[in-house]
Amino acid sequence: MKLSEFKFALPAELVAQHPAANRDEAKMMVINRATGTIEHKIFKDIINYFDEGDIMVMNNTKVFPARLYGNKEKTGAKIEVFLLRELNAELHLWDVLVDPARKIRVGNKLYFGESDLVAEVVDNTTSRGRTIRFLFDGNSEDFSKIIETIGETPLPRYIKRPIEEADKDRYQTIFAENKGAVAAPTAGLHFTKQVMKRMEIKGVNFAPLTLHVGLGSFRTVDVEDLTKHKMDSENFIIESTTADVVNKALDNKKRVCAIGTTSMRALESSVSANNRLKQNAGWTDRFIFPPYDFKIANCMLTNFHMPESTLYMMACAFGGYELMTKAYKTAIKEKYNFLSYGDVMLII
């Protein structure tokens, strides 16, 4: 398929600037692939679509405050430094994006507020990308504490309002455990302890994996021929305990629901020769677009995505292109909220 086939007009007012007042009360569109029907529910109704022995696969990555603001030495110019990934914990070496990039060259030093933290630019990686070394004597734990203090919740740019204290909590799933994401796995944001408890009482199991979400999901696709698009790599881990419960559910013909595109990408990057989930750890740059034969999950929970985004393409691959086109037209007509803080879709 071609990039232009994933184009649609998204009204600006449907891009959610705040989350729903209560996590589990966002609107939920339920799409049945077998019947082609579309239902309108709220998220807490999700319990009605799952039974004993079904599995929800959740991404337990934890967002860290990746957006820093520093000042360039001598000029004092304000520079945004967005932490992408740690390259060397001992040396405090990081891959970052800087803005404005034209002002930042190798050898420049950046000073971060009253924290006494200083960083030196050691390499150019892309037009906005730099490798920087934080000149810090302490260990990783101490360094993390400083970043937690001076960093800002990395809300996506399409949320055009100042960061609020509530974002620290709301831009994080309640099951976040393993720090390393610079964007939230947003389908998971709708879960509350109450919803999870009710599902567990019903016999639904939650199986964790970790995929540290990078900025790749926000990167625009700029080639019409999708086979030429290259995804950014993201680090993931699937433990044997998760593989075992997922495979048992598959053997018993139960529902295996990927909570979000990140969980789905990790699952599809860990398929054994006999189409079962295997324990795995590493990096994945898997790009899923139609047509695609999904091997593990037979159900998917995902927010409403940007036109021409790799996330929308994955939803189309899973739900079927025609049905998803219809669903998105319906979502716009019914004024569903889109993107990270928006409403959610359950594809069964």
UniProtKB/Swiss-Prot annotation:
GO terms for MF: S-adenosylmethionine:tRNA ribosyltransferase-isomerase activity
This protein's record includes keyword Cytoplasm: yes
Listed GO biological process terms: queuosine biosynthetic process; tRNA wobble guanine modification
Enzyme class: transferase
Protein purpose: Transfers and isomerizes the ribose moiety from AdoMet to the 7-aminomethyl group of 7-deazaguanine (preQ1-tRNA) to give epoxyqueuosine (oQ-tRNA).
Family the entry assigns: Belongs to the QueA family.
Assembly with partners or alone: Monomer.
Protein name per its UniProtKB record: S-adenosylmethionine:tRNA ribosyltransferase-isomerase
Organism for this UniProt entry: Cytophaga hutchinsonii (strain ATCC 33406 / DSM 1761 / CIP 103989 / NBRC 15051 / NCIMB 9469 / D465)
UniProt gene name: queA
